[in-house]
Amino acid sequence: MYEYRVKKVIKVVDGDTIDVETDLGFDISITQRVRLAGIDTPESRTRDLAEKELGLEVKELLKHKLEEATSIIIKTEKPDSTGKFGRVIGWLHLDHEEISFNQTLIATGYAWEYDGGTKQKDFGLLKIKRAESSL
């Protein structure tokens, strides 16, 4: 695993994509778009109002958690872990937590597991998991 320290969160694009400035060391940093690995969240920019509502909720949750965090690390499998759209694919770790925030989003009903195949759209399941979670 490769680790990159986030110096600054520039923008939360949606529930599974963020723009960040990462520290490469020696006072060198780079701005990158990061896609959270292994998850898919409801879209926040869609005409489907039920999906949009859930998508905006997870976007706001992610924004809030990033603002609260004192340490943000992106972990990747390879030094250049970019996906087909040029985004870095990585696991988000907040405040030195061993479990990634990606996994937390799945466990609490804010995201589905995603391996790059067919996307899920079972919003009812997400709502049930959210109601049961304490996030």
Where are these regions (language model features)?
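Small beta-barrel nucleic-acid-binding modules, primarily SNase/OB-fold domains
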Residues: 1-135
